[in-house]
Structures are given as structure tokens and as C-alpha cells.
Amino acid sequence: MSEFIYLASQSPRRSQLLALLGVRHELLLPDADEDAEALEAVLPNEAPAAYVKRVTQLKLDAALQRLKRRGLPAAPVLCSDTTVALGRKIFGKPTDAADATRMLKELSNTTHRVLTAVALGTARKREQVLCESRVTFSAMSSRQIQTYAASGEPLGKAGAYAVQGRAAAFISHMSGSYSGIMGLPMFETAQLLQSFGFKV
């Protein structure tokens, strides 16, 4: 059995959460010529749960190929993807502050879902879990939205906000997994790791 795993994610939050589980990990980041963002394209009429699970599998496929291509020591690879959904509408990462403003206006004064899929796999075995949480935003003023969008924090975040950042001031209620909303659900990830023989 391997003594460590690879984390195929550029998210510092996921790395921090994984470290809390006590499992040693090494980053397995995309090569410069890999278009990682292209994997996140939404298919027509794709449901949010199907989308986030498909993208996570694509990320795992790409990471396992990367591992083989680089000739690195074999070990399980962990991938994760988070998306925000209002009904069937998927909110990915905003392209700029104006896009973040548009997303936040739509999410203001609503309860939306945050779906995080996690996959752990090797060339011979793979497992996947899905964690769904709900977040309720209060009614945000235009000034609050514009100030937050201009802060830069929404960039690179699904739904244009970070639950562990300034956006917490707008969240009136949440249910489910706080770590899942951050990007790596601890309970479900621990279950995956245990299924691969890791002691968590």
C-alpha cells in the first residue's frame, strides 16, 4: 500500500483540508501545455450533479495520464471539483469582477446548492463520492456586491464567493458540509481514503 497520495488540485484550501486528515500528499499539477479549464466546460442541459461528477472524473483521467507521463512513483490520485447551482443553473468560476457581480446578484437572497465531487483512483481502481450542501445568502445591496466583487476574492471560486472569506458576512444559513463548501468534504474524503487502506 502507498504511504502517500497525489493531490491533483491547485487549490490551497484543498491541500490544507487534506493535511488535517493526516495523510501525506504531494501536488500533481497540470503541465504548462495542459488546458485544465477546458475540462470544466458545461454540456447542454447538463444537471449540476452529473456535471460535477463528470468533471471530477475527467480531472482524474488527466492526472493519472500526467503521473504515467512523468514516470513518478505509483500512488492514488485525489481530484475534486466544486460547483454552485441555483435550480439547474450551474455557476462556475467568474471570468472577471463584472461576471462575479452578475453571479452574486443572482445568488443574493436565495438558497442555492454547493456540490463537491471527490474522486480517488489508481490505474486499476477508482472511487467517487458526491457531497451536497445548501447555502442561503441574505439580500445583498448593490454596493456590497460591487465592493466584494472588486476585492478579487470571488475570482477562481465557483459561484463567485469563498465561504471562509468575506462572503461569510452575507450567509444567513448553511446546511451540509462546511468543508465540502470550501472544496473538500472531510467526512466523505476520509471514507474514500479508508477504502484505499489509509488510516484516517
Swiss-Prot record:
One of the GO biological process terms: potassium ion transport
A Gene Ontology cellular-component term: cytoplasm
EC primary class: hydrolase
CDD domains: Maf (cd00555)
Catalyzed reactions: dTTP + H2O = dTMP + diphosphate + H(+); UTP + H2O = UMP + diphosphate + H(+)
Domain of life: Bacteria
MF annotations from Gene Ontology: dTTP diphosphatase activity; monoatomic cation transmembrane transporter activity; UTP diphosphatase activity
Chief location category: cytoplasm
Function: Nucleoside triphosphate pyrophosphatase that hydrolyzes dTTP and UTP. May have a dual role in cell division arrest and in preventing the incorporation of modified nucleotides into cellular nucleic acids.
This protein's name: dTTP/UTP pyrophosphatase
Species, as recorded: Albidiferax ferrireducens (strain ATCC BAA-621 / DSM 15236 / T118)
